[in-house]
Design a protein with these regions (language model features):
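Catalytic metal-binding/acid-base residues of hydrolase active sites
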Residues: 51, 191-192, 241, 285, ...
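Acidic-and-aromatic substrate-binding clefts and catalytic sites of carbohydrate-active enzymes
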Residues: 60-64, 133-140, 163-170, 244, ...
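Aromatic-anchored helix/helix-loop segment that forms the rim or "lid"
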Residues: 259-291
Length: 346
């Protein structure tokens, strides 16, 4: 079973029986109280989906936030390091970031300076992903230079849409070319596009649209050639890949071979590009999304994430007791893969 989880992407034929056996094999090691589980891991988790709520932004969250509050919660749940990013808690907040105004650009710079300060004050406990002033391409290129060269960010964060465009749009290609040149880590955070708000009365937009919009973003990158032509960007997809793993067959089957250089290898090439993505598991450690993620991608691509403080740690930690995995795969998810992406936290 170890080979089943650790094998290369081309060897990902996990049957239902395989999956049940894998869960059973890991149960003895992982169906334990949190303190015992954490004690088995010599180094704590690295959380790549962890939000900061700066004091100069009046943003509602169900939990009070400060760096100290995060540290206390991280210690409680066995997390050694968190990589901070801004949040798309509401569509309005994402709109503020992407309204292309000087006010929005100033706020983004403040956010980035704040994230850098928190990380420099706690260099072993926090990193940060810089925000970009989309959709202003020139401003984004300048912010990339500032945040990487001056602030020493650990990567960048983008929302999955800019209101009416998705990241694979040719307008944004210079941004991806620059990130590719820098071999950057890029974390996508879900948003709700203007087209798809209030579609189902009584259902919050984020319930469905966060994961559907993430899937749109990844497909836009795939079909416009960004994944194939910018191979040095390490892309992190939220929520165990959102709907990408479940829809990967449809995505590959509907790729047109005439896309040529956009997706070398046609349908087979499309699937390989999806398998190269990294998948963090915030609020997605239930059996079905984990099974889909593991069917698509090898264990080298799994990352820990919690979406704290928007969601409590328990929503990600708790379901793992019902969906255990082999200890080596659990370690890769908890820490091992992130330590490769961010060597300074190794």
């Amino acid at each position: 079973m170890k080979d089943l989880f650790q094998g290369h992407a081309k060897e990902r034929a996990i049957t239902r029986r395989d999956w049940i056996q894998a869960l059973t094999a890991g149960a003895a090691a992982l169906a334990l109280p949190a303190g015992i589980v954490n004690a088995q891991v010599k180094r704590g988790r690295i959380d790549v989906h962890h939000h900061m709520m700066p004091p100069f932004v009046d943003l509602w969250t169900p939990r009070k936030w400060s760096p100290q509050v995060s540290l206390e919660t991280m210690d409680k749940f066995g997390t050694e390091t968190s990589v901070l990013s801004v949040t798309g808690l509401t569509p309005l907040y994402a709109d503020l970031f992407y309204d292309n105004s000087e006010r929005a650009k100033k706020l983004i710079r403040q956010m980035n300076d704040y994230g850098a300060k928190v990380a420099s004050d706690n260099p072993k406990r926090f990193g940060f992903f810089a925000a970009l002033p989309m959709p202003d391409v020139d401003a984004c290129i300048k912010e990339i230079a500032y945040t990487f060269d001056t602030l020493k960010c650990d990567g960048v964060m983008m929302f999955t849409d800019t209101g009416d465009k998705w990241p694979g749009d040719p307008l944004y290609r210079p941004i991806f070319d620059e990130l590719n040149r820098r071999k950057a880590v890029l974390f996508f955070h879900p948003s709700v596009p203007k087209c798809c708000r209030g579609l189902i009365p009584g259902t919050g937009d984020t319930t469905l649209e966060f994961d559907f919009d993430t899937t749109r973003a990844i497909v836009s990158l795939l079909n416009n050639g960004v994944l194939a032509q910018c191979p040095d960007i390490r892309i992190i997809v939220n929520h165990a890949g959102a709907a990408v793993p479940a829809l990967s067959g449809r995505i590959k089957d509907q790729v047109r071979n005439k896309q040529g250089a956009s997706i070398p290898g046609g349908s087979a090439g499309a699937l390989e590009e999806l398998r190269k993505l990294y998948f963090e598991v915030a609020h997605a450690t239930f059996g079905p999304p984990l099974a889909a993620m593991m069917k698509l991608a090898p264990s080298t691509q799994y990352l820990w994430g919690t979406d704290y403080p928007v969601w409590p740690y328990e929503t990600t930690v708790g379901p793992l007791y019902d969906t255990p995995m082999p200890p080596d795969v659990q370690y890769a998810l908890d820490r091992g893969n992130a330590a490769r992406l961010f060597p300074k936290f190794a």
